[in-house]
Design a protein with these regions (language model features):
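Short coil turns that delineate tetratricopeptide repeat
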Residues: 111-114, 154-157, 192, 226-229, ...
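Residue at a conserved register position within TPR or TPR-like alpha-solenoid repeats
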Residues: 90, 126, 170-171, 205, ...
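Alpha-helical segment of the N-proximal tetratricopeptide repeat
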Residues: 79-112, 128, 132, 165
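TPR alpha-solenoid repeat register
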Residues: 116-119, 162, 197, 231-234, ...
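Catalytic-center loop of serine/cysteine hydrolases
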Residues: 1-88, 92, 97
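Canonical positions in the second alpha-helix
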Residues: 108-109, 151-152, 186-187, 220-224, ...
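Structural signature of tandem alpha-helical TPR/SEL1-like repeats
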Residues: 98-104, 135-150, 173-186, 208-220, ...
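"A position-specific structural signal for the A-helix of alpha-solenoid helical repeats
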Residues: 85-89, 121, 128, 165, ...
Length: 331
């Protein structure tokens, strides 16, 4: 029941190198996944080339998916690492019930001896619940998330994924831009192939006012996660920075992509509602607003237009939130 990974390098000409990779399963070598890419040589081996890093991440995701796809009942699992991977899949479903299931899985993984990653993802999970404004969150959510961050950092302070998750949590719950910058920089240095690390650094730069650099970093995160089953997350990360750097059409396209792959992910719906209104597409704005209201019962066009606490801050900073046009379809 083992998996076999094969990687082959080849030359197409003097300046180009290609990589082929495949994952086989069992004695028969049944194909699970295959991929290939090529890049230009510029002296040193192209280990940091975005296409090659992306191919490596796709291979890792394919292996992880193959190991979990046949599992139908998580209650039978006694492997902490496998439980953590299943929980991460549930987290990126982004539905309230899926996040609750993921939290239970991660708690069990901790009881089975999981590393700091389980604590970090439990903190990240609560961050998502907070931003998504889920109805089932408790008043102690921020404090619980902070304790989980402390636990994760004490146990594995040099784990790139732990640092990225803690960076995100510190930024959103504590508004600590400096901490997010430092943690995400170290996360990137420890693993430059980690898209969550680049995404965290992009978000830190965004809130630090370095918008153009934030967008470049978000583009990098999206590119190296190309083909990921969680692509909607990276698409929306780039949507944020596109909006803040005045790239309205790009932001709309990215939000549409994120919504297509995760219809119940609320932030793309919020941004599409506002961006369609600003682009003089009132019918589309109204349609997105109606979808959002089914997921977020206290949503209103008026609140989006005038409530500073409503979670679309980058749109307000960018000037792309046209309150008059948003309100034009209110009621």
């Amino acid at each position: 029941n083992s998996f076999r990974v094969e990687v082959q390098a080849y030359r197409t000409d003097a300046s180009t190198v290609g990589i082929r990779a495949r994952v086989g399963h069992g004695k028969s070598g049944t194909l699970v996944w295959s991929g290939m890419t090529s890049t230009q040589l510029h002296g040193a081996p192209p280990v940091e080339d975005l296409e090659i890093v992306s191919l490596g991440n796709q291979l890792i995701d394919a292996l992880a998916e193959a190991m979990t796809v046949t599992i139908s009942e998580s209650k039978e699992i006694r492997d902490a690492n496998l439980l953590t991977r299943l929980a991460i899949r549930r987290i990126f479903c982004l539905r309230p019930e899926a996040l609750a299931e993921a939290d239970e899985m991660l708690a069990r993984a901790q009881n089975l001896g999981a590393g700091a990653l389980s604590s970090a993802w439990r903190a990240q999970l609560r961050l998502i619940q907070h931003v998504e404004r889920h109805e089932n969150i408790t008043e102690d959510l921020p404090e619980v998330a902070r304790r989980l961050c402390i636990d994760a950092m004490e146990r594995e302070p040099m784990n790139s994924m732990v640092l990225a998750a803690v960076a995100n949590t510190r930024l959103v719950l504590d508004n600590d831009v400096t901490a997010c910058l430092e943690l995400s920089r170290r996360s990137v240095s420890l693993n430059p192939a980690n898209p969550l690390a680049w995404n965290s650094l992009a978000t830190a730069k965004l809130y630090a006012g370095e918008h153009r650099e934030a967008h470049a970093l978000a583009v990098r995160a999206q590119k190296i996660s190309s083909g990921s089953p969680f692509g909607h997350w990276w698409d929306f990360g780039r949507c944020l920075t596109a909006a803040l750097t005045g790239r309205r059409d790009e932001a709309i396209h990215l939000a549409e992509a994120a919504h297509a792959f995760s219809p119940e992910f609320r932030p793309p719906l919020r941004y599409l509602t506002a961006l369609y209104a600003a682009a003089d597409r009132p019918d589309d704005a109204h349609r997105m607003g109606q979808r959002l209201q089914k997921l977020e019962p206290d949503f209103s066009f008026e609140r989006m237009a005038s409530d500073d606490s409503y979670p679309i801050s980058p749109l307000r900073w960018s000037g792309l939130l046209d309150s008059g046009k948003v309100m034009a379809r209110h009621g």
